[in-house]
């Protein structure tokens, strides 16, 4: 799988073959704006966790098209991570992650080029069901969390102090 990073007028393509490579990728994105993150209300770790949830959701549900029922069945069987890593290695889709910093905010845009989802409903039911917990975490992490109409592009915004 390829992840395309757009940051500071640079386009970088990174090959990812394992879900464990996501955390270092997030650190790379965040470290490219090392001064900006320190000016935010949220902690570095909290933002890292929120971004991780959004990127993993983009991989699972957007790029791979993994449905919630199958995901939880794989988790119950203890085969989720192996399944996910196998699919990631075979995946031809890419995900775009763009980090945009201004005087007032840092915005991370994640585009999975998938079919999208009904994000308004998903955010509403996330508080009461197992489905959507990652979205609920992200919603509580960022000052603004929005999606395009079909739900395949996410905008996560952190305002500066």
Task: Describe the residue ranges of each PLM region.
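Glycine-rich/acidic phosphate-handling loop/turn and adjacent ATP-lid/helix
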Residues: 69-132
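Short, function-defining helix-loop hinge/capping sites that tune catalysis or transport
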Residues: 65, 119-120, 142
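Hydrophobic alpha-helical segments and their boundary regions
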Residues: 46-47, 51, 103, 123, ...
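Flexible, glycine-/charge-rich segments associated with ATP-binding catalytic modules
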Residues: 1-20, 104-108, 115-116, 128, ...
């Amino acid at each position: 799988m390829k992840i395309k990073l757009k940051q500071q007028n640079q386009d970088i393509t990174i090959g990812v073959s394992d879900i464990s490579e996501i955390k270092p990728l997030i650190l790379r994105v965040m470290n490219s704006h090392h001064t900006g993150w320190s000016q935010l209300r949220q902690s570095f770790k909290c933002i890292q966790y929120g971004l991780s949830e959004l990127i993993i959701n983009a991989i699972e549900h957007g790029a791979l098209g993994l449905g919630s029922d199958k995901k939880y069945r794989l988790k119950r069987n203890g085969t989720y991570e192996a399944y996910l890593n196998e699919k990631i290695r075979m995946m031809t889709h890419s995900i775009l992650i763009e980090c945009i910093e201004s005087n007032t905010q840092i915005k991370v845009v994640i585009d999975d080029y998938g079919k999208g989802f009904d994000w308004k409903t998903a955010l509403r039911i996330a508080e009461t069901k197992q489905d959507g917990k990652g979205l609920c975490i992200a919603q509580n992490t960022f000052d603004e969390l929005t999606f395009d109409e079909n739900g395949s592009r996410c905008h996560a915004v952190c305002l500066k102090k």
